[in-house]
A protein has these predicted regions:
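C-terminal regulatory/oligomerization modules of transcriptional regulators
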Residues: 80-97
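Short, charged/polar surface micro-motifs in flexible loops or helix N-caps
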Residues: 26-27, 76, 91
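N-terminal helix-turn-helix DNA-binding core of bacterial DNA-binding proteins
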Residues: 2-43
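Glycine-centered, phosphate/nucleic-acid-interacting loop/turn motifs that mediate DNA/RNA or nucleotide
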Residues: 55
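Basic, amphipathic "hinge/linker" alpha-helix immediately C-terminal to the N-terminal HTH DNA-binding motif
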Residues: 12, 63-85
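Residues within the DNA-recognition helix of helix-turn-helix
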Residues: 47
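Short beta-strand "wing" residues that participate in macromolecule-binding interfaces
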Residues: 59
């Protein structure tokens, strides 16, 4: 498996990078992620579980039996990749696509 294929196994599923992008702003509660992203709750639960298992994010216990999610160092390492993808999506990358 190539390095890119290995990375896509972790963050290539729909919504995964959008969850990571949202968490770059800091820890978020489940309900806030769901509302801000508009992702179906069952899909969000699955993506959070997958990203946690891969060491990209962690759950933080809060009061009243609620949790927040925050990026680990491994998740924070995706910042440059996410910013580059955003620039590419805007067409700001020089050269031909």
């Amino acid at each position: 498996m190539s390095d890119l294929a290995a990375a896509l196994e972790i963050v290539g599923a729909r919504w995964s990078l959008l969850v990571v992008e949202r968490l770059l702003d800091g820890p978020q509660r489940y309900g806030d992620l769901q509302r801000d992203l508009g992702v179906p709750t069952n899909v969000l639960a699955t993506r959070l579980r997958e990203l946690e298992a891969a060491g990209v994010l962690t759950r933080l216990p809060l009061r009243h039996n609620t949790r927040a999610y925050a990026l680990t160092d491994r998740g924070l390492a995706l910042r440059g990749t996410i910013l580059a993808l955003g620039e590419w999506g805007r067409g700001d990358v020089t050269g031909e696509i």
